[in-house]
């Protein structure tokens, strides 16, 4: 028997920037027993991320920016090194990531390769992230990057080996970035 889910109630607790739901549902277990659950679910929309890499220079482009959630959770500076990313905002994932790449890193990417889609925190967050990689070259630099309006983003071009080491030292602690760097390493694209 497959599990059956019945929505009992969906109460919106907050919808200031993203939406926080309080969901009550019945879950029929495989053994037939019905269990009532009540959970908070944070709907922040879906997103996309991209890792830019250069096989000739053996470099990657990452960004550093303030992330309030990490600061609240003990990251003293709140600064996080991560891959370029953004919310889809009704765009297709590839359209979104091309816009984000030029806004955040300053690079106008050519061919992009979609790797996979992953839920990053499925216990309470709805977000599905689309993961991409793209090779970049210096002549694709259209502007300085740094984000738009209220963003304060530092663009980092790092040796690939240094970025991998930064995972070990804890300087890179962002899940999507670790996944993309590890993908690049295991795919041997930088060998």
UniProtKB/Swiss-Prot annotation:
The keyword Magnesium applies. GO terms for molecular function: GDP-mannose hydrolase activity; magnesium ion binding; protein homodimerization activity. GDP-alpha-D-mannose binds at residues 17, 38-40, 67, 85-87, 104, 127, 150-151, 176. Residues 43-180 form the Nudix hydrolase domain. A motif (Nudix box) lies at residues 79-106. It catalyses: GDP-alpha-D-mannose + H2O = alpha-D-mannose 1-phosphate + GMP + 2 H(+); GDP-alpha-D-glucose + H2O = alpha-D-glucose 1-phosphate + GMP + 2 H(+). Changing residue 149 to A: Does not affect catalytic activity rate and substrate affinity. Changing residue 176 to A: Decreases catalytic activity rate by a factor of 820 and substrate affinity by at least 2-fold. Its EC number is 3.6.1.-. Mg(2+) 1 binds at residues 85, 104. Homodimer. In the dimer, the N-terminal domains are swapped between the two monomers, such that residues of both chains contribute to the active site. This is GDP-mannose pyrophosphatase. It comes from Escherichia coli (strain K12). The lineage of its organism: Bacteria, Pseudomonadati, Pseudomonadota, Gammaproteobacteria, Enterobacterales. The gene is nudK.
């Amino acid at each position: 028997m497959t599990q059956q889910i019945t929505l009992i109630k969906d109460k919106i607790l907050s919808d200031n920037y993203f939406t926080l739901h309080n969901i009550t549902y019945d879950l029929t277990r495989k053994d037939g027993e019905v269990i009532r659950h009540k959970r908070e679910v944070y709907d922040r929309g879906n997103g996309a991320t991209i890792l830019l890499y250069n096989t000739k220079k053996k470099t990657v482009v990452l960004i550093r920016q303030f992330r309030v959630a990490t600061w609240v959770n003990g990251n003293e500076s709140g600064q996080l090194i991560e891959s370029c990313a953004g919310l889809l905002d009704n765009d297709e994932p590839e359209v979104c990531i091309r816009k984000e790449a030029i806004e955040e890193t300053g690079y106008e990417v050519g061919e992009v390769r979609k790797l996979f889609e992953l839920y990053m925190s499925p216990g309470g967050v709805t977000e599905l992230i689309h993961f991409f990689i793209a090779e970049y070259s210096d002549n694709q630099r259209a502007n300085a990057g740094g984000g738009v309006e209220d963003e304060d983003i530092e663009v980092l071009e790092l040796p690939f080996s240094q970025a991998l080491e930064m995972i070990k030292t804890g300087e890179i602690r962002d899940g999507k970035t670790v996944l993309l760097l590890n993908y690049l390493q295991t795919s041997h694209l930088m060998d």
